């Protein structure tokens, strides 16, 4: 594995942002009834995976994927709350805390 460089972290951050954008577009697509948002969602997912592929050139795949997925879920939850008024119940919050704890454990391992 190549030595870590900040450019790889930037690629990972871009992948996370693109995943969030894809999820928001997917919600706006209303089950692909609004085709433009559905297509934008697919394009954002492809771009997110492309950015992730660049990130793993300098970050271990297990770490990059865990961070990408974890931050993507947490930020999508925030976007759902802000944009759509969606709320988590107690079990959802427990799951989010466990997810964040798992991300920390992977990073520290």
UniProtKB/Swiss-Prot annotation:
Entry's InterPro entries?
A: Small_drug/metabolite_transptr, Small_multidrug_res, Spermidine_export_MdtI
Asked if the Swiss-Prot or TrEMBL record annotates the protein with the keyword Kinase, the reply is no
Can you say where in the cell this protein is located?
Cell inner membrane
As for what it does, the entry says: Catalyzes the excretion of spermidine.
Q: What is its main location?
A: membrane
Give the record's family classification. Belongs to the drug/metabolite transporter (DMT) superfamily. Small multidrug resistance (SMR) (TC 2.A.7.1) family. MdtI subfamily.
Per the record, its GO cellular-component terms are: plasma membrane
Q: Which GO terms describe its biological process?
A: glycine betaine transport
Molecular function (GO) terms listed?
A: amino-acid betaine transmembrane transporter activity; antiporter activity; choline transmembrane transporter activity; spermidine transmembrane transporter activity
Q: What is this protein called?
A: Spermidine export protein MdtI
**Key words, A-Z:** Cell inner membrane, Cell membrane, Membrane, Transmembrane, Transmembrane helix, Transport
Q: Which organism is it from?
A: Escherichia coli O81 (strain ED1a)
> What topology does it adopt in the membrane?
Multi-pass membrane protein
Assembly, in brief, is: Forms a complex with MdtJ.
The regions listed as transmembrane in this protein's record are 6-26, 36-56, 64-84, 88-108
């Amino acid at each position: 594995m190549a030595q870590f460089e900040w450019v790889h972290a930037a690629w990972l951050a871009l992948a996370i942002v693109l995943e969030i954008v894809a999820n928001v577009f997917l919600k706006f697509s209303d089950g692909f009834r609004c085709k433009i948002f559905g297509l934008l969602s697919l394009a954002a997912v492809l771009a997110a995976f492309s950015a992730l592929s660049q990130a793993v050139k300098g970050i271990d795949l297990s770490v990059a994927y865990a961070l990408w997925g974890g931050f993507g879920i947490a930020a999508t939850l925030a976007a759902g709350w802000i944009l759509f008024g969606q709320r988590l119940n107690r079990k959802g919050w427990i799951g989010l805390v466990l997810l964040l704890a798992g991300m920390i454990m992977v990073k520290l391992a």
